[in-house]
Amino acid sequence: MDEDYVKKQEATIRNVLVKNLMESYVPFPLDKKIATQWAYAINVPRGGSTIIYTSYMYQMANVFKSYEKYVPTFGSLGSSKIIASIGAKLIKPKEEDIKRFNAILQNIYRIVKRSNENIGYLYEEEPYSGSLLYELGFMDEFKEYGKKVFELFKQHKVSNIITIDPHTTNTLTNLKKYIGFDIPFTPYLNLIKEAKGTGKFVLHDSCLYSRFLGMYESIRTTIRSAGVELVEDPTVTGKGAGFCCGGPVGPLNDKLSNEIAKARAETLTSVNKDVLVACPLCYANLSEFCNVKDIAEVIA
C-alpha cells in the first residue's frame, strides 16, 4: 500500500468526516427522511428516557461502500462543501437496501419492546456515534465530537440506550473511557427474549463483539436458543480464529478491503454455504462474495 496515497486518503476522509459530523451529526450526506422511515411506519414514540440508538449504521452501511469508491475523486476536489454536494447527488441507498434495513430495524425494535414497552427513538435528531473517527485513529476529533454526542443525549434527557450494532457499542464504551460518557447502554442482543428463528448458518464474528466486548459465547447462545443451527469449525469460527471482514480498511483502500472480504467469505463458505452476521458493515462487505443474512433477519 503506497504511504503517500494512504496519507492523502486519510487527509481527505478526516476533512469530510469532521466537517459533516460537527455540522450535522452524520459522517456523510444522508437523507434522514429515508433513514427514519422505519420508525414512522410503526409509530415508534419520539424521544423518551430509554431509546433505541441506530446511529444510522444499518441505514448507511451500503452507502459507506459507495463512498469508499469515490474517495480518490473527492481527494482531488479539495473543498469539503463541494464533496458534500457531489456526494449527496451521487450516492443514495438502493430501494432494495432501504426495504431491507427498514425490515431489520423494525424487527429489532419489536424484539427489544418485549423487555421494555417504553422505548423511543430520536428520529432526525439522532446523532451518528463517531465510530469512524475512533477506528481511523482521529482521536482528538473523536473526543471533541463525542462530547457533542454526549451533550445532545443529555439535552434529550436520555438515561438509557439500546445499541444495535458492534461499532456503536464499542464507540460508547470508548467514550465512557475517554470523556466520561455515563449514560448506561446495552446491546439489543443481550435483551432478546423468547425469540424464534430458523436456518443453518456459519457465524462470521464481529471483531468488536467477540474480541473487544466479550460477547463471543453469549451471541451463540442467543442464536441457538432461538432455534437457529450454527455450524462451527475451530479453525474458522474459533474464538481466536476469526478475522476481519475488511470493512475498517475500506475508507483508506477499497481494493484491499474487497480482497480481505473475499478471503473471509471463502473460509466461511468452506464451513457452510449460508453466512450469518451481527454487523451491518460485515454484511455490506461480505454480501458481494457469499450469501449473508443478519441475525435480525432470521430471528424474531
Predicted feature locations:
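Phosphate- and divalent-cation-binding pockets in alpha/beta enzyme and binding domains
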Residues: N170-N174, A284-E288
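A short, acidic, amphipathic alpha-helical segment used as a generic capping/interface helix at domain edges
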Residues: F150, L256-K273
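Ferredoxin-type iron-sulfur electron-transfer modules in oxidoreductases and energy-metabolism complexes
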Residues: M1-V18, K255-A263, I295-A300
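Short, flexible loop segments at boundaries between secondary-structure elements
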Residues: F181-F201, P234-F243, C290-A300
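Helix N-cap/beta->alpha junction signal
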Residues: I164-P166, A278-P280
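Redox- and metal-dependent alpha/beta enzyme cores, enriched for Fe-S-associated oxidoreductases
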Residues: S115, G197, F201-L256
